[in-house]
From Swiss-Prot:
Residues 67-297 are extracellular. It holds the Pfam family Glycoprotein_G. This is Major surface glycoprotein G. One of its GO terms (biological process) is symbiont entry into host cell. The gene is G. Residues 254-285 have a biased composition (Polar residues). Disulfide bonds join C173-C186, C176-C182. It comes from Human respiratory syncytial virus A (strain rsb5857). Glycans are attached at residues 70, 72, 80, 85-87, 92, 100, 103, 105, 113, 119, 135, 137-139, 144, 147, 199, 203, 219, 231, 235, 237, 251, 253, 269, 275, 282-283, 287, 294.
Amino acid sequence: MSKTKDQRTAKTLERTWDTLNHLLFISSCLYKLNLKSIAQITLSILAMIISTSLIIAAIIFIASANHKVTLTTAIIQDATSQIKNTTQTYLTQNTQLGISFSNLSETTSQPTTTPALTTPSAKSTPQSTTVKTKNTTTTQIQPSKPTTKQRQKKPPNKPNNDFHFEVFNFVPCSICSNNPTCWAICKRIPNKKPGKKTTTKPTKKPTIKTTKKDLKPQTTKPKEVLTTKPTEKPTINTTRTNIRTTLLTTNTTGNPEYTSQKETLHSTSPEGNPSPSQVYTTSEYPSQPPSPSNTTN
């Protein structure tokens, strides 16, 4: 019941805290507006009331938290007092540990604890604790827990005869040592271990080496072009061989109407034919007299 009450009060306090914060915000926003003096005074009074209520709520929170803390400390103190009352007032002397008991007054006596002797092995050693009473101090011997972890034992090696015998539904004979009933029930398992699987590796295909041909372009020599030199034209030697002067008379009476004297220049070609292109008249050469040998009557 107390827990539910505390939860309810906490929820109500949270709600009031939130509402008061909202009211403060709203009042501050309204105060910033240019209202009349009366409205501003009322808003300021509301803000003061809300701020005081917030302070009260915070005090309630702190008080409830302190109450919870005091409750827990009181419970712990009650538990410790009950443990002290239930403990034995005195114990017999233990000769193995060599513990001596002495009655001491409350002013001089202080609770002392002897630490437990811990060995590297996993064996547990007793640990002594002292409890303070009004006039005497008593010790309790409590077995201490082993500090070191126990090593896990390795499983025993299985015999070679039974290979994974827990799978089978029958009892292998390797287990039966001297039990006749076991020998009557058991069955012998052959000593054949599963052989190693022969793994055939895939044969690699022979790699055909392809030699790259030289893809160089074949250099063909250009055909020799016959260069014909221009033949020299034969030089025509023109020589004056025969100069014929002809004197033509139209009538035998001695009245020359037209006299003409032709002078032909014959050029000697390689064939020997005279070239008729060169014809000279006597009018062109007036200074040369006609020769008597070439005249015809």
